Amino acid sequence: MLPSAVAAHAGAYWDVVASSSLLNFPAAPGFGNLGKSFLIENLLRAGGAPPLGLPPPQHHGSAAALGAGAQVRSLPASPVPLKLCPAAEPVSPGGAPYGTRWAFQVLSPSADGARLPGRAPGDPDCAFQPPAPAPSKPFFLSAPPFYSACCGGSCRRPASPTAFAREESVLPLLTQESTSKVRRGILRRAVFSEDQRKALEKMFQKQKYISKTDRKKLAINLGLKESQVKIWFQNRRMKWRNSKEKEVLSNRCLQEVVLQEDPLSRSALGFPSPCASLWEVSQQHPSPGWRENSPEPSERLIQGSPGAEALPPEAKSLQGALYLCSEEDARDKNALTGTV
């Protein structure tokens, strides 16, 4: 058999398998005959009858084939490994090599090591075994060619948009549940009537801290809950403390302002008057008796007194101090110094 006939026979066989048996979809233009569509053998084969022993290739869609009563050949239910391998480059009679042709080959666990014609005998990746018997379950007819042929049909189609719930429909449910849980713990503010408020205020003036029994009685009389009465007393005590603190602070500020403006008002407010300085006292009493009765300097006292050498240092320091005293105190002091 000529190489051209062998190549034509192999090309027709793979076109039939890829188009009708494997995918049942019309092959894409130039996919199965990549690089060979311009050859004379392909043009003659496309215009004339197919070789003997092979059915004519079906290029119409699956709907037309099913409508005409043609039986679709299905693949095994188990994943069938597919392998992509480059075919050998057979030499044409003119000496020009054919282009490299890629094809999906179906491999099945069979001991038959037959090889396709037109393939290199030393290529281990291009071995062909007859496929297993077809089961009754058809192949994915509605699947695209890429997802059906890739990885032996194990690749899944992308999920439709309606397969999963939309986020917009899920988020409102979550937000409603979370907000409802949060709102359950929040207590609504009780609105008291004028009579209830007056009764509560009257009880607060009697006692700032209400007992449990009194609180229960007051709640029953006013038609309130014990928790409402308890919360009202807590808020009222806090308000009372804040008012007391503000009052004390305002009084202190007022006193400080008054003292800064008028120092003589200290006696009116009950504050003790500050002690007068020595200079003010000396200016208020300029009588000569004070000056005469004032002690002499420490040097003269130490030199004039006979027992000055035996005085301790504390007495010496006291003698050197300035004493402002009356005439009677000066006489008593002179008598004491004479006895010493």
From Swiss-Prot:
SMART domains per record: HOX
Keyword Protease listed: no
The keyword DNA-binding belongs to this UniProt entry's keyword annotation: yes
GO biological process: epidermal growth factor receptor signaling pathway; G2/M transition of mitotic cell cycle; gene expression; neural precursor cell proliferation; regulation of transcription by RNA polymerase II
Gene3D superfamilies from the UniProt entry: Homeodomain-like
Entry GO CC: nucleus
Residue ranges flagged as DNA-binding region: 185-244
Location of this chain's protein in the cell: Nucleus
Coiled-coil ranges per UniProt: none
Superkingdom per UniProt: Eukaryota
Pfam family, one: Homeodomain
UniProt keywords, alphabetically: DNA-binding, Homeobox, Nucleus
Cross-referenced InterPro entries: H2.0_Homeobox_NeuralPatt, HD, HD_metazoa, Homeobox_CS, Homeodomain-like_sf, HTH_motif
Record region (Disordered): 283-313
Molecular function GO terms recorded: DNA binding; DNA-binding transcription factor activity, RNA polymerase II-specific
Family to which this protein belongs: Belongs to the H2.0 homeobox family.
Protein name, as recorded: Homeobox protein DBX2
